[in-house]
Amino acid sequence: MAKMRAVDAAMYVLEKEGITTAFGVPGAAINPFYSAMRKHGGIRHILARHVEGASHMAEGYTRATAGNIGVCLGTSGPAGTDMITALYSASADSIPILCITGQAPRARLHKEDFQAVDIEAIAKPVSKMAVTVREAALVPRVLQQAFHLMRSGRPGPVLVDLPFDVQVAEIEFDPDMYEPLPVYKPAASRMQIEKAVEMLIQAERPVIVAGGGVINADAAALLQQFAELTSVPVIPTLMGWGCIPDDHELMAGMVGLQTAHRYGNATLLASDMVFGIGNRFANRHTGSVEKYTEGRKIVHIDIEPTQIGRVLCPDLGIVSDAKAALTLLVEVAQEMQKAGRLPCRKEWVADCQQRKRTLLRKTHFDNVPVKPQRVYEEMNKAFGRDVCYVTTIGLSQIAAAQMLHVFKDRHWINCGQAGPLGWTIPAALGVCAADPKRNVVAISGDFDFQFLIEELAVGAQFNIPYIHVLVNNAYLGLIRQSQRAFDMDYCVQLAFENINSSEVNGYGVDHVKVAEGLGCKAIRVFKPEDIAPAFEQAKALMAQYRVPVVVEVILERVTNISMGSELDNVMEFEDIADNAADAPTETCFMHYE
């Protein structure tokens, strides 16, 4: 059997597991791993400017394409702790990423050695496995188990910590004998699925709630097929958005307290059954459980056993991978269709479509400074059907979810449960690295943009082009809006007179100068009529220079975005739409190509 360093064996494992890209920042304690990566070849390395940035790039890489696993590399100590936010974000959204850290030699682990920290203990609560490998011969097997765990059951992240002496130790390993472990996914039984479909048939006004598990399982096509067979409207969650095109007749809108459509909430409240697949009934989707479940039967299908009953007690709970369940659901529905047992739901579908045509929010404003709604309207016009949006949190994200349109799975890339500021730039770079031909447009408010702004240099250095729409109100907008309940506007202002950039008109940071200083291109817009030309200019600059292009739109300082405490108590702070001119890019008024 061949003898080699443990890190050289690790390279063979990564190759056999399909890894071709890694994001990271080298350091003394991880240098042996980097030496093996250089020697082995086959892995493209993208150098981040911050290890947290690298870990969010790995998230974006995984989320972009089915089957991907993003890899993040860092040294000991602070590099590992910098990865914790991404591990939390990935764990919360069931996203597999592999974080590999260097560590002090084993003999120094408990002697307060330089940058020696118990990263295993720190990372365990936010990962499926976190382990410091103390025996060199175990390195390939620990990595094998890591890939098995990341892919099996509810997907999630893993951290593998490698002490310096473990990395360089010589072990016996035969690469030709290595095989990835079989992946385990729980699957619904035929009896369970037949019961679920029978309950669906009995309902008069059912809706399917499709969550991120449908996207993670690469089951969007099956979801749409099942909905079409049964004529049941679909309500995607924020993480499931794109599983059915926004302009599909059965797309009933999103539901919730913030990232929701008026017509979506109205349809849910009019329903008598919720058929949940791959969703977790998050509180910002449901509001109070009492209101959400009132008068409705609930079916819940999820890959994670402990999700069934965690938030609400369903009438039928099934533990299953979404793809396995939907495969059987389609099969059973087809059999019932042939037997003439599927009810006609034309009236219910027509009611949903009517709400979709009439319960709209106004987006067309000509105000100066610009209202954010107009920005999203212009984005709908400019970027077309194939656009892939990347965003994280804040009023910019909430308004985007209310007003943009998504037509394909994995074309709304959003960290859902964790919502860390700074996520958008590195995640967008990770998406582009996974699929360089994808039409990626990122959306940030000014605070999210500033958190990890240095990662724009990565896009410039490695020629990773995308468009970043920056909506700037010089405020922590979502926090300002939530502070209204406390009758304050406290510690949330980002505006100041910039002594070096009078042209920003008191909005503080000159994002154009910063972006250009990092090697990117940037455009600033003050008037609504200049937004569309700026987007066209951005496309041309991106094609010419192959770098990120920032389009900053200076907004009015204060805009309150629709949100509320219950599904039937969402406050509309702006005018609602009365006609097509008020909301010209809604799918009922505009054809998307």
Swiss-Prot record:
Cited CDD domains: TPP_Gcl (cd02006), TPP_PYR_POX_like (cd07035)
For the biological process aspect of GO, one term held by this record is: glycolate catabolic process
Q: Name one Pfam family in it.
A: TPP_enzyme_N
Q: What EC designation does it have?
A: 4.1.1.47
InterPro entries, per this entry?
A: DHS-like_NAD/FAD-binding_dom, Gcl_TPP-bd, Glyox_carbo_lig, THDP-binding, Thiamin_PyroP_enz_cen_dom, Thiamin_PyroP_enz_TPP-bd_dom, TPP_enz, TPP_enzyme_TPP-bd
* Enzyme class, spelled out: lyase
Q: Which reactions is this enzyme annotated as catalysing? A: 2 glyoxylate + H(+) = 2-hydroxy-3-oxopropanoate + CO2
Pathway(s) it belongs to: Organic acid metabolism; glycolate degradation; 3-phospho-D-glycerate from glycolate: step 2/4
Any stretches that span the bilayer, and where are they?
Answer: none
Describe what upregulates or represses it. By glyoxylate.
Q: Which GO terms describe its cellular component?
A: acetolactate synthase complex
Q: Copy out the cofactor comment.
A: Binds 1 Mg(2+) ion per subunit. Binds 1 thiamine pyrophosphate per subunit.
The function of this protein is: Catalyzes the condensation of two molecules of glyoxylate to give 2-hydroxy-3-oxopropanoate (also termed tartronate semialdehyde).
User: How does this chain assemble?
Assistant: Homotetramer.
Task: Kindly give the PANTHER family that the UniProt entry links to this protein.
Answer: GLYOXYLATE CARBOLIGASE, THIAMINE PYROPHOSPHATE ENZYMES
Q: What is this protein called?
A: Glyoxylate carboligase
Q: What is the lineage of its organism?
A: Bacteria, Pseudomonadati, Pseudomonadota, Gammaproteobacteria, Enterobacterales
